[in-house]
């Protein structure tokens, strides 16, 4: 009788263990990532470039002729703190539709994740001069006199200045630099990590990341294009404002 009870107990334990394994199993899937852009809710696409369609927080009427930026270290964080890297780096170009959407090459576990994050630009360790052939071919390099490495963002266009005359601007974000020349110095890091928050990964799911372009001109510092328009790369004060204003430019939308 005792042997029968022991056998029954072992059988139940094994069955419970097998069922637990099945419950804990997770499927894997590819995920589509899409990047969209807007100006305080008004969609910005390639078809809307070059027109004087946008007014920043200071009141400058402006156009956008080019917008491209670099993200790196795109990472999903599990609820237990473990991380999964989705993408090493990617150049996003609003004029190039193929850069705005892609499917992950590696399979990703389905389920809930506590955070999706990426670095805007490159960390200093990755920002190695001339190391990325694809970025070199895009003329994405920063001159050696400014520290070398790569741009974080290029946003170019025109605005109406105080004389109501069209004037160009080049809102180019790089690693903030002082003393351009043979021995430049770096007052502070100006790459930053964007934490988008919790996401749920489903079979053949889609993640949408949106940039509000207007944020680069308003929060926390109101940007007057009459004061800051060109030659911004060697201007560390301007670079630090870009760094601060960009913190709230990205959001996660319509995760499904």
Which residues fall in each region the model found?
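A short, solvent-exposed, low-complexity linear motif enriched for acidic/polar residues
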Residues: 20-256
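C-terminal motif of bacterial Sec signal peptides marking the signal peptidase cleavage site
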Residues: 14-17
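Sec-dependent signal peptide recognition
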Residues: 2-9
